[in-house]
């Protein structure tokens, strides 16, 4: 899995940063892309990346502020023009369905695919055999969600060396054993596949937050995550201002990462007051509290579990 930061700015686009959108590329895991927020010009950013709209499966909106949703109608329309035909599910706060449907209706846009809207409440909002997604409220003046994406543990690897050491050669039988089946060999031996499968591989956890001030629900959403994506609209000494504007600072994000025992913190939603040089200072500030911190720039790609 990879996180592709399509927009990393706060509020309005700047020369260096577009407004918020993050793609979670799951091509190896499920051959799809999930999108988190869709600020204005997200589709332009996608054209500059390796992301394909045809692979888009789900869109998760954190909150209804314009810098997180104004790119949706255009992106959905372009996907249709490009021949996209698979269903997309959009998750988000109450109002997301009305916003999208009204924009498409008033612009006379007819899509070639179905959209399913899921206006969410805190709790488990999606689960299949591979992943689950949990949402919870943050604190931002308007309703704002954080998302916790949990990859389910994968089956352990088949111990081929152990099998060969016992005179069992590779072939179709290996797949049956990998599936945990009990197999009778030509020589009469009965082999239980479960005895040749290693420990399960722990699935990854990614926590992606919308805009928020410091709030208690953050800890559980972030706990033990492989990657925490957190806004850092302000530098560390502007905690009072951040609270008044319902945003967070670099140090608040870093302290949460440390407390939640995450493996990596990625800062995004950077105010336009901070140019590239000033952004480097933000990173140094956060690293003073939580060393494994990165600051995202537009089109940056991060491997999950790297």
Curated annotation (Swiss-Prot):
It catalyses: Endonucleolytic cleavage of RNA, removing extra 3' nucleotides from tRNA precursor, generating 3' termini of tRNAs. A 3'-hydroxy group is left at the tRNA terminus and a 5'-phosphoryl group is left at the trailer molecule. Binds 2 Zn(2+) ions. It comes from the Bacteria. Its cofactor is Zn(2+). The active site is at residue 67. Zn(2+) 1 binds at residues 63, 65, 140, 211. Keywords: Endonuclease, Hydrolase, Metal-binding, Nuclease, tRNA processing, Zinc. Pfam families: Lactamase_B_2 (PF12706). Its EC number is 3.1.26.11. One of its GO terms (molecular function) is 3'-tRNA processing endoribonuclease activity. Zn(2+) 2 binds at residues 67-68, 211, 269. SUPFAM superfamilies: Metallo-hydrolase/oxidoreductase (SSF56281). Homodimer. NCBIfam families: PRK00055.1-1, PRK00055.1-3, RNase_Z. Belongs to the RNase Z family. Zinc phosphodiesterase, which displays some tRNA 3'-processing endonuclease activity. Probably involved in tRNA maturation, by removing a 3'-trailer from precursor tRNA. This is Ribonuclease Z. The lineage of its organism: Bacteria, Bacillati, Bacillota, Bacilli, Bacillales. The gene is rnz.
């Amino acid at each position: 899995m990879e996180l592709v930061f399509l927009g990393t700015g706060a509020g309005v686009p700047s020369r260096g940063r577009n407004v918020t959108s993050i793609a979670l590329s799951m091509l190896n895991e499920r051959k799809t892309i999930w999108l988190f927020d869709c600020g204005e010009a997200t589709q332009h950013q996608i054209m500059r990346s390796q992301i394909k709209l045809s692979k888009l499966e789900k869109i998760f909106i954190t909150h209804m502020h314009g810098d997180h949703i104004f790119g949706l109608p255009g992106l959905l329309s372009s996907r249709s023009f490009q021949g996209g035909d698979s269903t997309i599910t959009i998750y988000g706060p109450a109002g997301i369905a009305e916003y999208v449907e009204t924009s498409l209706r008033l612009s006379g846009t007819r899509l070639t695919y179905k959209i399913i809207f899921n206006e969410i409440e805190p709790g488990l909002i999606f689960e299949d055999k591979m992943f689950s997604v949990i949402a919870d409220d943050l604190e931002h003046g308007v309703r704002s969600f954080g998302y916790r994406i949990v990859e389910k543990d994968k089956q352990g690897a088949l111990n081929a060396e152990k099998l060969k050491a016992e005179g069992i050669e590779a072939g179709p039988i290996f797949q049956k054993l990998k599936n945990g089946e009990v197999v009778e060999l030509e020589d009469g031996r009965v082999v239980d596949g479960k005895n040749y499968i290693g420990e399960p591989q722990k699935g990854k956890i990614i926590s992606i937050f919308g805009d928020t001030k410091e709030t208690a629900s953050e800890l559980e959403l972030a706990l033990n995550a492989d990657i925490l994506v957190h806004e850092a609209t302000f530098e560390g000494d502007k905690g009072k201002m951040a609270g008044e504007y319902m945003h967070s600072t670099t140090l608040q994000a870093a302290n949460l990462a440390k407390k939640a025992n995450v493996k990596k913190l990625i800062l995004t939603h950077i105010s336009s007051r901070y140019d590239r040089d000033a952004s480097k200072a933000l990173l140094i500030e956060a690293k003073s509290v939580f060393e494994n911190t990165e600051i995202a720039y537009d089109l940056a790609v991060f491997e999950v579990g790297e």
